[in-house]
Design a protein with these regions (language model features):
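Extracytoplasmic metal-acquisition and chelation regions
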Residues: 1-223
Length: 223
């Protein structure tokens, strides 16, 4: 960070951030229903947790690419044409991904999905879905038994067949909810890191997002 030639890019600048979903009550937060916060701020209902996961919306990812393109072109004008060319190619890939999501999630039996980590709010909003998070923006937080039971009851009401969890975090809570309602667990990857196996297999943002779409379509009963 002390490198004077380092280019810092505020990738989300200019993109409208959404309030984060706090999810269920967490151990140590007290009983504040779905409005409970994190990091000891449960009682501060005026504190807003902004959701940073804009890259999980393909259009948000496109915004990030544009920000990086412009910053690099400004920092190295002699390579600006190359940066713009590469960015344009990737933006076309992202536009195709966006179209796949739009078509793939257009006709589904369910519009609500349950996940341990509230990382998919932008994706849900973009494609007309509703995210229900068990553990809010902090994927390691433990919900209280009372809050967990409320999640179980709501999942039953929606006839949920799958509870999502993410690759790099324990699936314990997802399994508890799934077992209570006779559902299964399935991965919804927030692309916050790749396993060594995924790296070796050449996985990237596009492949992970397409697998997410496949899993969403299965869970939502899409045609």
């Amino acid at each position: 960070l002390h490198n004077r030639d380092l280019v810092a890019v505020e990738a989300g600048a200019g993109f409208t951030l959404r309030d984060g979903e706090d999810g269920a009550d967490h151990e140590g937060d007290g009983e504040h229903g779905g409005d409970a916060g994190h990091d000891g701020e449960a009682a501060d209902h005026d504190h807003v947790h902004l959701d940073p996961h804009i890259w999980l919306d393909p259009q948000g990812a496109a915004h990030i690419v544009g920000q990086i393109r412009d910053a690099l072109a400004a920092a190295e004008p002699e390579h600006a044409a190359e940066y713009r060319k590469n960015a344009e190619s990737y933006l076309q890939d992202l536009a195709a991904l966006d179209e796949e999501y739009t078509a793939g999630l257009a006709q589904c039996e369910r519009r609500v999905f349950f996940t341990t980590h509230a990382a998919f709010g932008y994706l849900a909003h973009r494609y007309g879905l509703e995210q229900r998070a068990i553990m809010g923006l902090a994927p390691e937080a433990e919900p209280t038994p009372k809050a967990l039971q409320a999640v179980v009851e709501e999942a039953r009401e929606h006839d949920v067949k799958y509870i999502f969890f993410e690759t790099l975090v324990s699936d314990k809570v997802a399994r508890v909810v799934a077992e209570e309602i006779g559902a299964e667990t399935l991965v919804l990857n927030p692309f916050e890191g790749l396993t060594p196996e995924q790296i070796a297999a050449g996985e990237d943002y596009l492949s992970v997002m397409r697998q997410n779409l496949t899993n969403l379509r299965l869970a939502m009963g899409c045609r």
